[in-house]
């Protein structure tokens, strides 16, 4: 699973609010909602956030392995 928990930490460190992302950088509210819910997001959005925040992809997202499903 891809998780975007690091995005919110990076936003805080860079002193950029969600309001600012929407108002000044044109990030769609629906995209932010998808990120909040760890849902599918286009790589274009990830690239854009990295440019806005001047950061690397690992600063806004991480891979967390899904729990293995045991076959019984």
Model-derived segments and their meaning:
Residues 1-20:
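A short, Lys/Arg-rich alpha-helix, primarily the initiator
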Residues 9, 61-72:
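Short, charged recognition helix plus adjacent turn
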Residues 12, 26, 37, 65:
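Residue-level detection of the helix-turn-helix DNA-binding "recognition helix"
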Residues 12, 23, 51:
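Alpha-helical residues within the helix-turn-helix
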Residues 15-33:
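Short alpha-helical DNA-recognition segment
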Residues 38-51:
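Short, basic-rich loop-to-helix N-cap that marks the start of a DNA-contacting helix
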